[in-house]
Amino acid sequence: MTNIQHTLDFTPWPQESARYYRAKGYWQDKTLFDHLLDSVKTHPDALAIISGECSYTFQQLHDKVTQLAAGFITLGLKSGDNVVMQISNRAEFYICFFALNMQGIKPVVALPAHRTLELSYFCRHAQAKAYIFSDDTPGFDAQKTALTLQDECASLSYLIHTDQSVDSQITELSTLYEAQGIAQNSNANHVAFFQLSGGTTGTPKLIPRTHNDYAYSVIASNAICNFSEQTRYLCVLPAAHNFPLSSPGALGVFFAGGCVVLAQDSSPQNAFKLIEQHRITVSALVPPLALLWMKHAETADDDISSLKFVQVGGAKFSETTARELPNKLNCQLQQVFGMAEGLVNYTRLDDPIDVIVKTQGRPMSPDDEVLVVDDEGKPVPVGEEGALLT
């Protein structure tokens, strides 16, 4: 076994910045679970999640979260621990996400595409106490991988599988839910979880996101995107990705009292059926998937008229294709450029069409600071390419 001796240090915001963010109302000193709890109180019987044949109201989601949180503590996890979580598009992703961070346990949200190399790095670098995973990716034996990770990572005490396990060392998630939930044990100033960098420079880096800063990103995004209790959001991109998690994503839907519909199959054939069945109002796509949706719409007979707008981000969307999308899908286009580190840009829903199709928007916050610089770190003239500092 390889034992990593260092721990992950977190440098908090300067006190002056923190005071300013609170004075402006950006930081509300509420945890992610607190924001979910607001919707539980105001919309207890409204549907929060639809995942295949399963569905959860906000009250049911709350109960599952707190019961699982109690089970995690009984198992041996505690506030301050880190875990690696690799769960596909299913309700358990959000249940585990909230159950962990409402107890001060910080998940590293790995993507379904990550394999042993990346997962081993996450576990060792974060000194993860647990690996929580689903096993529904074709060609990937997650349970075998879990056992390999435990051999490689001395800190990894618990392997937790969302379904039936094939080895006594792997705990089934369903056995952890306790009859009674547990009270919250987390702090809005503390790290809620670790996002992953989306760059192409080797293994993704861990990005600590606090409850305060991440909640602000979600709430500010909701205001721009008009998310409400009427929003029905189709999650076709990996649930762990920053875009469908917080821009405004599933968290935005939960905070607004709307409903998240999860798609494990991202094909347009499946997506269009779900749009018709659940009267989806918005979804987030990457450009290649947007192209597939547009192509499928030419011959599909599904009723997708409930769609109000589609977000496209993650890569540059060509102007020509962007101009075609509203006509092909009969809805508005919103372009998004976001970074897991924090900066998020949106075209506004009422922007002129040239702004919507030619740009990826402007920063969501009036206090975002951006600068385009050359190789020497000097600002470049307007219109010239360079590196983005934020």
What are the residue ranges of the model-derived segments?
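Structural core segment of the AMP-binding/adenylate-forming
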Residues: 1, 102-173
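Conserved pre-ATP/AMP-binding loop-to-beta segment of ANL
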Residues: 44, 161, 175-198, 203, ...
